[in-house]
Curated annotation (Swiss-Prot):
One of its GO terms (biological process) is cell wall polysaccharide catabolic process. SUPFAM superfamilies: alpha/beta-Hydrolases. Its main location: secreted. This is Probable feruloyl esterase A. Involved in degradation of plant cell walls. Hydrolyzes the feruloyl-arabinose ester bond in arabinoxylans, and the feruloyl-galactose ester bond in pectin. PANTHER family: FUNGAL LIPASE-LIKE DOMAIN-CONTAINING PROTEIN-RELATED, TRIACYLGLYCEROL LIPASE, PUTATIVE (AFU_ORTHOLOGUE AFUA_6G06510)-RELATED. Belongs to the AB hydrolase superfamily. FaeA family. Substrate binds at residues 98, 101, 268. Its EC number is 3.1.1.73.
Length: 281
């Protein structure tokens, strides 16, 4: 894993201090540990869920051969939650989905008025929708007092966002954690997500959109093509810590997106010191 230099870290922190008038620096250790836990699961999804927390029980796999969408249903009896995690880009087939920027009506969620979502990720979603809904229903029926958590990194983050949106129409206890999420839909979709996941305040939000340093993927697809982000952004700046995590609730270009990153870079593949699929944590 490549390490950021101390000089670069200071530059990022200085930039943050100048640009984030509508944001706050520092989160609680409990929330930080929660974000790290979800990042661990999301990064482990690239390597068949290696080194996930010991409290988590690995359940059924989600898979479609045509789209190469991979995911799992997990359960944590300690935290009382059912976790759906999606792997990020892992093949040329996934890359074809990544680069399909055509905004597409979110037809599987008609109550999301005027919502359009990333065309490639919508293809991915409908390829596994029946599996996901069936497996979640099975687990939720067996464990009715458990929360439903959805997470993922990169492509997996957008898959998580579409999944969480769909599940929120049926269940009222859905939480979403994404890492390096591309813009997943238009402003109507972002607004729907913000309403459904109580994003009006960091105290109420159930949509935690985590970014890192100058990760270039959250800048894609371009806003100029009709895309927008939802959620409360939690921007992690190196050296990563609870204190170096910014809560960004204003304009989405204040934090990660303002750093000028483009595409897949070191900041995208590594979150909280964990590199996608490396399993060295």
């Amino acid at each position: 894993m490549k390490q950021f230099s101390a000089k670069y870290a200071l530059i990022l922190l200085a930039t943050a201090g100048q640009a984030l008038a509508a944001s706050t620096q520092g989160i609680s250790e409990d929330l930080y540990n929660r974000l790290v836990e979800m990042a661990t699961i999301s990064q482990a999804a690239y390597a068949d869920l290696c080194n996930i927390p010991s409290t988590i029980i690995k359940g059924e796999k989600i898979y479609n051969a045509q789209t190469d969408i991979n995911g799992w249903i997990l359960r944590d009896d300690t935290s009382k939650e059912i976790i759906t995690v999606f792997r990020g880009t892992g093949s040329d087939t996934n890359l074809q989905l990544d680069t399909n920027y055509t905004l597409t009506p979110f037809d599987t969620l008609p109550q999301c008025n005027d919502c359009e979502v990333h065309g490639g990720y919508y293809i991915g979603w409908i390829s596994v929708q029946d599996q996901v809904e069936s497996l979640v229903k099975q687990q939720a029926s067996q464990y009715p007092d458990y929360a439903l958590t959805v997470t993922g990194h990169s492509l997996g983050a957008s898959m998580a966002a579409l999944t969480a949106a769909q599940l929120s129409a049926t269940y009222d206890n859905v939480r979403l954690y994404t890492f390096g999420e591309p813009r997943s839909g238009n402003q109507a979709f972002a607004s729907y997500m913000n309403d459904a996941f109580q994003v009006s305040s960091p105290e109420t939000t159930q949509y935690f959109r985590v970014t890192h340093s100058n990760d270039g993927i959250p800048n894609l697809p371009p806003a100029e093509q009709g895309y927008a982000h939802g959620g409360v952004e939690y921007w992690s700046v190196d050296p990563y810590s609870a204190q170096n995590t910014f809560v960004c609730t204003g304009d989405e270009v204040q934090c990660c997106e303002a750093q000028g990153g483009q595409g897949v870079n070191d900041a995208h593949t590594t979150y909280f010191g964990m590199t996608s699929g490396a399993c060295t944590w």
